[in-house]
Design a protein with these regions (language model features):
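Active-site helical microenvironments for divalent-metal-assisted chemistry
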Residues: 1-197
Length: 197
């Protein structure tokens, strides 16, 4: 079952006040300000935090999830994250980013070969195993699954090919991975959202 979330609109200090409170270089602050001017990018981190809060994840995981979209948009470097938020958060973000290499491998496999159910099943299972092996902290995998849920919600306005590719990736890799890790809520949500496409 898909959870309906609403990014909380509780009173927060303006973005500029929060940004000024961070001890970042002016160049980095400018990048963050540019990224924050596009509301969808900001909401991804908040949505990921809401997903992870439902799983009772620790504060470090929540902070890494909130910072991750900024790193993806190249508004924060890994060094900026380590300096401002700490090594542990940086390591989680790096682990999540490392998992993106699998996306391109899976996309090449889908587009580059004829359908062979047994070989595809073995390939996908080996991808799942690689994902677990390549990250040092399983929390990075959970953050990535939350990010994929957000990606499934965002692709509804994309072209058909993109929607199908993201849905296949989530249904064949991340939903079974969530099941393997015993996180039923994420598994169901990934499957339900992927089924739409």
């Amino acid at each position: 079952m898909v959870s309906t979330r609403k990014v909380h609109a509780a009173e927060r200090p303006p973005f500029e006040v929060w940004l000024d409170s961070l001890s970042l270089s002016e160049e980095t602050k400018e990048k963050l300000h540019h990224v924050s001017s596009i509301p969808e990018r900001l909401l991804v981190g908040q949505e990921m935090v809401e997903i992870l809060c439902q799983l009772n994840m620790d504060d470090v995981t929540l902070q890494a999830a909130l910072v991750f979209p900024y790193c993806e948009q190249h508004a924060l470097s890994e060094n900026d994250i380590a300096q401002e938020f700490g090594e542990e958060i940086r390591d989680l973000v790096v682990g999540v980013r490392r998992m993106d290499a699998i996306k391109s491998l899976h996309a090449r496999k889908i587009s580059g070969s004829a359908f062979n159910e047994k070989s595809d099943e073995q390939h996908i299972d080996s991808i799942r195993r690689m994902l677990l092996a390549m990250v040092e902290d399983v929390r990075a995998v959970v953050i990535k699954m939350a990010e994929r849920i957000c990606a499934l919600q965002q692709v509804k306005k994309a072209d058909e090919e993109t929607r199908v590719m993201v849905a296949r990736e989530c249904a064949s890799i991340y939903a079974p991975l969530a099941n393997r890790l015993g996180i039923g809520q994420l598994k169901w949500e990934l499957e339900d959202l992927a089924f739409r496409y």
